[in-house]
Amino acid sequence: MTSVGILILAGGEATRLPGKLALAAGDLPLVARVYRNFAQPGRETYVATNRTFAPELDALLPVPAVIDRWSRRGPLGGMLTTMARMRSRFVFAVAGDAPFVTPALLALLLAELRPEVEAVVPERRDEDGKPFLEPLAALYDRAAFLREGLPVLRAGRGALQLVIRRLRAHTLPVADGLTFTNVNTPSDYAALLQALGQYNS
């Protein structure tokens, strides 16, 4: 059985929507809903963050929270800091504001694993048909990510795309845009609430 840990990204400055991870998404705050999607007894699960949570939110996340060693370097810093603490061979990284990312997507990514593959990353297409990746809903070989991610960060860069290029990565076309819905602005949040209503109906 493949050893897979869960890494929930809950850092970021959220300048356009402060406190977004604590906003209600159905019956739970946004980040707690993401945690619930993947919570399993015995599954290694961590939260990467750049701040301590309010007690009421912290109580809904009964897993270790790791403070990012590299502030203002994007999700890469939080992923590297947290993966260094983890033990699972593979890590599924998921954004804390993406409540429609579910174990069904993780199962699809796991099915694409091969001995030589170091990352499986969903690929979508924009309105013009140009492909783009979803690195915050992706599966990574933990040791390989640490090996290739640290040089990128130490070179003064923070782009996950650069790390993925250094990995033996496999992309998986995924057409369902709802899965990757996240929240950066008040209008995003309004759209998410509308989508949640349709999703739960």
What are the roles of these predicted feature ranges?
Residues 2-157, 165-181, 186-200:
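Nucleotide and nucleotide-moiety/phosphate-recognizing core
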